[in-house]
A protein has these predicted regions:
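Catalytic-site microenvironment of enzymes
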Residues: 1, 5, 9-390
Length: 390
């Protein structure tokens, strides 16, 4: 019903994803000081196991791509790995054509200033691109039907600000490229649907969909056919319909801990897929999902790197190393999930047949908890179990 209503409001035609070209840009790409390294409870700032946008953005994009390709879309990703080029590659400026043979300008070599640019081939011929000018050139060459750049936002470390934000090229309500504003507005309710996080601003029916010039200031390019450094940190330089999404704020401590969990990021990518699919009028999935965060029923989380919004679900201590067992309607244990040690309590089960299931939670020092849940096709059932100390 949501997808149908949005199609009516924005004039989206129900054609589906088959044959559509979707360009996904997981923001950043390396493990440098420019890739938003931030200390977490278990890891120092520049530890590659700590938070970097590089890793979380890629996890989101890979999951979105998995679903889009399954639905018949042609998906191009600016990168599929995280890392650095070797010094010899930097010296030689080696570049290969990407998997779709859309070559960048031949004179455009690897810039030695960008040591976060990745190696050129992931084994499938996929070129790895990080530089913003280079991404813009590739997007303009491919001319995708939909562009999406995935990021997370930043405020002051320890701030409780945490909201979803979508930016297109141009001014608010006046995108430089037709349908960019509509794409973001169709996406919004899907992306906003995350009960595992705590939003500080906006709502499902009050979106933050803005033009980059209106939001950040800058010099309008004068013509959509000119690439200029303007607007939102010069990210939106391309000439194609689409937008950039700041999925949350990694400077909100509990959210940063969640972004260390790959499956939490996959859930965000799944929501983006749903928004893209809705825009093109694609068919709903036949499978459903379960996701949640296991927390203590009585203990509040206290740590210098864990400032939470007062009165929110984030005040309760996430439980590390909790075993979550999934049983089908016959009582057969079909899957299990071990929450990580990163103080987020996240668990998730993907691609489940619709029906009734039972979840059993077991963690050292806590009473066992069992709950029933129903999986619905094309939906994620979110749970927030709280365990009582023994």
């Amino acid at each position: 019903m949501i997808a149908f209503a949005l199609m009516c409001v924005f004039g989206v035609q129900a054609k589906g994803l088959k044959g559509k070209t979707i360009y996904l840009n997981p923001g950043h790409g390396g493990y440098t000081s420019g890739d938003r390294p931030t200390a977490t409870i278990n890891h120092e700032q520049m530890d590659t196991l700590s938070f970097y946008e590089t890793r979380s953005n890629l996890w989101k994009a890979l999951e979105a791509a998995r679903h889009l390709r399954r639905d018949g879309a042609r998906v191009i990703m600016s990168r599929t790995r995280s890392g650095y080029v070797t010094q010899s590659q930097m010296d030689e400026g080696i570049l290969n054509e990407n998997q779709e043979s859309h070559a960048l300008p031949s004179e455009d070599k690897v810039d030695k200033r960008y040591n976060q640019v990745e190696t050129t081939d992931d084994g499938t011929g996929q070129q790895q691109i990080v530089g913003l000018e280079r991404i813009a050139c590739q997007v303009d060459s491919i001319k995708p039907d939909y562009f999406l750049s995935m990021h997370s936002n930043a405020h002051k470390n320890g701030s409780t600000v945490n909201y979803l934000l979508m930016l297109h090229r141009g001014e608010t309500g006046k995108p430089y490229f037709e349908n960019s504003d509509s794409m973001a507005r169709v996406m919004w309710p899907y992306a906003f649907d995350n009960p595992l996080s705590v939003w500080s601003h906006y709502s499902a029916d009050k979106p933050a969909v803005v033009g980059d010039i209106s939001w950040m200031g800058g010099t309008p390019p004068g013509s959509p056919n000119r690439i200029g450094v303007n607007g939102y940190y010069a990210v939106l330089k391309f000439r194609a319909p689409g937008f950039l999404v700041e999925g949350s704020f990694h400077t909100y401590d509990p959210e940063r801990q969640r972004l260390l969990n790959r499956d939490y990021c996959r859930l965000e990518g799944l929501r983006y897929y749903r928004g893209i699919r809705a825009y093109f009028g694609g068919k709903p999935e036949k499978v459903g999902y379960i996701a949640g965060s296991v927390k203590s029923a009585t203990e509040k989380m206290e740590h210098p790197l864990y400032t939470y919004r007062e009165g929110s679900i984030d005040q309760w201590k996430p439980i590390n190393y909790c075993m979550v067992y999934l049983y089908d309607s016959r009582g057969v244990n079909i899957k299990a999930y071990h929450t990580d040690q990163e103080w987020n309590g996240i668990f998730a089960f993907f691609d489940l047949k619709p029906g009734k299931y039972t979840l059993r939670y077991r963690a050292y020092g806590y009473e066992e908890l069992t709950e029933e849940v129903e999986v619905v096709a094309d939906k994620t059932t979110y749970l927030l179990p709280h365990l009582t100390q023994k």
